């Protein structure tokens, strides 16, 4: 695990990250966690675990790092500059395809958040209505593959749709009319933001239009950490699970703690987002512990990535996730 917090902070400051420290626990194991992006409702259980002392009770002194770019967390994890990172199932597969020995050790958001979103008087309510439209995305290869699969599934000729890379400007691209829809906006973030702006967004979720379901947000560690430090990781993952359980018990209190740690956030928006996202923090199978990942689901999504030539190495899929650190597992 990472040691020497001052040295680590110096190394990371050169990489353009913001580092958030939490109160140190004397004698606790220092551990660094890099978020996938800026703090938001998806991370509410992390901040709840900090506020409630769940990590401290587990003998861990957790330090949160906020990346300047969502592509950074797995790179920093690969380089050994953070102990664990939050990322996305497709990104884990892509990193493993390049030979990076990374493993997902828990799912935070257990279904896709990525959606097709449209606004205006001519809502796009079905994939078939994408015909003749301009669709904006962030330019990611797997988003292009999503669109191709969706169009094929809806029997829409790919040439009838113009794909436009709008970067992170998904909402402005929709509001300006530059695109008729976006693929990449989250139904629990951009769509709720548009609702609060009274823009009446229409949302089509990925798993409704031919894309195999996947875990949008996952906790990732190096395989060497899973092998060499399973006790620390197990304590971390299970403390995190207690944080998310507390969110389910009292979403308002959890949002209060999220906003207290990140004063720039809008409390009303975050509460709306947390309430919308809450069911996805837990398995649909109540017998499964928090963080559960379905091997069948990971294999099916990995096979889709292979079929789409996003990855070429079957080993990128095999053993990409493990449930052995979850409560009641692997003991």
Residue positions per predicted region:
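Sec-dependent N-terminal signal peptides
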Residues: 1-7
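C-terminal motif of bacterial Sec signal peptides marking the signal peptidase cleavage site
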Residues: 11-14
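Bacterial signal peptide processing site
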Residues: 16-18
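Short, glycine-/small- and polar/acidic-enriched structural segments
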Residues: 22-167, 171-188, 204-205
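Pocket-lining segment of extracytoplasmic ligand-binding domains
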Residues: 90, 169-172, 178-264
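Periplasmic-binding protein-like
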Residues: 108-118, 199-226, 237, 276-280, ...
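Secondary-structure end/capping motifs
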Residues: 227-308
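Conserved C-terminal helix/tail region of periplasmic/extracytoplasmic solute-binding proteins
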Residues: 298-331
